[in-house]
């Protein structure tokens, strides 16, 4: 008899249980994926996420205190995080594109802390938003944003709210899409979406949302309100224009509305340029850290199960008054964004986030995934966990990957540990916000 739990379950019920789970947004890790003892998994995770400026609060989970750097000032800078729909790294001139469709983003990269080896955790907007807000590795099935028991979770807003920040999620579409309204409103975010735009504030819209320029102009007004209220702010802005049918206002760029992906990318780049042109005039600009990244790539299909190049996205952290431009080539992932920003703020805090400060303590690893496949990248290797087999190891070489014998056992255990622990923490309610 097979010792593989997946094979046993399929043998018992002809796949009913697996496919029921599949179509209900959740695949139970313990039932369908390779495991190691839970205590061992948690110990491995703890060893991999602890930073020299942190100490654990107990010996059973990842709760830890983050100390400030006494050699640096602490200041509550505003944080504006712009997630651009489907902005693959390959669209930018900084990554070798020769079609001149991202002139504003390329200039921004030159003036920013620019991360060249940065990866999305998944292939859907909700997976990217999950990674950035919760700073948690992807779990099997759908994003936590679309699953039950996702309210009052420990997330970026938990830390910023305690520090006195006003917190908002600004979206160009209707936030009932993919359960965004429920998730964000029940996790400390004020939600501003398409329903909050007056007709005068919309120059163009399509099925996905208002034009990116309208969204970003609306965001400027909201940030002005926050500044006038005298509170620092954390604002997460999600664009929509770089999405089929790729339509946008006429007369903005030299490519036509509906002209395909390149046209939509260039339009979004135009809107970003206009946003920063206006933002630089604001009194709050010099005290605001801007983070620009993508939710996921434009495509995820490839000749292999997890084509690494189809998860490669840009990350820029920008403020010309306080941050010196530089290029960072360390491997990193969307779950590292908020811990890195908190490192720049130098705010002491208690955390349950899974990411690391990649400017000061880079982990040099990344997480990628589909609905079923879970990938862990480190040391030029990719470990893939699937619900119907043991973990497989691949050697990475440029954009190519080659399956190898499992001679990277420690790395395989790391991969299993992160995905197993993250899944069990979600299932057991350990991602929930608690008083420290």
Predicted regions and their residues:
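N-terminal secretory/membrane-targeting segments
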Residues: 1-77, 109
């Amino acid at each position: 008899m097979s010792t593989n739990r997946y094979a046993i379950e399929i043998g018992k019920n002809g796949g009913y249980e697996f496919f029921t789970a599949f179509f209900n947004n959740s695949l139970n890790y313990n039932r369908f994926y390779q495991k190691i003892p839970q205590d061992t998994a948690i110990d491995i995770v703890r060893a991999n996420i602890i930073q020299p400026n942190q100490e654990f609060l107990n010996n059973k989970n990842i709760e830890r205190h983050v100390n400030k750097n006494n050699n640096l000032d602490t200041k509550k800078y505003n944080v504006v995080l712009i997630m651009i729909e489907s902005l693959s790294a390959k669209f930018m001139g900084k990554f070798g594109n020769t079609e001149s469709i991202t002139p504003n983003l390329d200039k921004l990269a030159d003036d920013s802390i620019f991360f060249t080896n940065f990866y999305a955790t998944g292939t859907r907007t909700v997976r990217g938003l999950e990674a950035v807000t919760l700073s948690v590795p992807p779990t099997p099935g759908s994003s936590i944003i679309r699953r039950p028991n996702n309210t009052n979770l420990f997330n970026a807003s938990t830390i910023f709210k305690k520090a006195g920040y006003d917190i908002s999620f600004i979206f160009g579409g209707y936030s009932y899409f993919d359960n965004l309204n429920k998730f964000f409103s029940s996790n400390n975010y004020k939600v501003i979406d398409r329903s909050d735009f007056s007709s005068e504030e919309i120059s163009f819209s399509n099925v996905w949302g208002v034009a990116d320029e309208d969204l970003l102009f609306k965001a400027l007004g909201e940030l002005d309100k926050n500044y006038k209220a005298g509170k620092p702010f954390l604002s997460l802005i999600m664009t929509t224009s770089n999405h089929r049918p790729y339509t946008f206002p006429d007369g903005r760029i030299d490519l036509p509305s509906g002209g395909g992906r390149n046209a939509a990318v260039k339009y979004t780049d135009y809107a970003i340029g206009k946003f920063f042109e206006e933002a630089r005039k604001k009194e709050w600009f010099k005290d605001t850290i801007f983070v620009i990244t993508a939710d996921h790539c434009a495509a995820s299909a490839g000749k292999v199960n997890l084509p690494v190049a189809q998860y490669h996205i840009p990350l820029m952290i920008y403020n010309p008054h306080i941050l010196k431009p530089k290029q960072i080539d360390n491997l990193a992932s969307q779950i590292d964004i908020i811990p890195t920003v908190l490192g720049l703020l130098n705010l002491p805090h208690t955390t349950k986030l899974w990411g690391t400060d990649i400017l000061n303590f880079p982990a040099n690893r990344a997480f990628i995934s589909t609905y079923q496949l879970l990938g862990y990248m480190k040391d030029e290797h990719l470990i893939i966990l699937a619900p119907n087999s043991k973990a497989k190891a691949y050697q990475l070489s440029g954009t190519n990957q080659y399956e190898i014998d499992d001679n990277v056992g420690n790395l395989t255990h790391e991969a299993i540990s992160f995905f197993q622990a993250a899944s069990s923490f979600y299932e057991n309610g350990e991602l929930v916000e608690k008083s420290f």
